[in-house]
């Protein structure tokens, strides 16, 4: 098994470095394409902190379905501020969660990619729609994004298992169907939860803006 890992290591490191470069490029591009006000930075920081707390709170279990509540601040950030907000909340929140739980490892960048992708994709869609969604549009966007996130998580699990010598197709792919269904269920729940949170934050920000 060690020979197999040594043979695959250059490939794995190439993937990890490529993912890191893509994330850096995405952050730089979105940052330059958006005016980052102090209020926006504070809101993104707050949502990032909420993500870390919810990530440690775990998931809501409904039988064999796991609902990930940590995705809420990422989706809210994307719906409020588009790809910049979504990407930064997902990227920073997932990085802090990984750092506090596992420290920095060879696959840290792979584990933060799914939430960064969720925020970026939902944010791009939000901007495309002028930040106004119907329930149907939001449902399709969140379910589609959930499928991408599940695929990225599965890829991260596989690469992590190979690098750390516990590779098992049963472990990585055995629960794939359950993860897909759980992701879709989480997306549907967020359709009902995220918009009221976004509206509440918008009203709060408008109040602060008026007071100034």
Language-model-detected regions and their locations in the chain:
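Loop-helix junctions at membrane interfaces
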Residues: 1-212
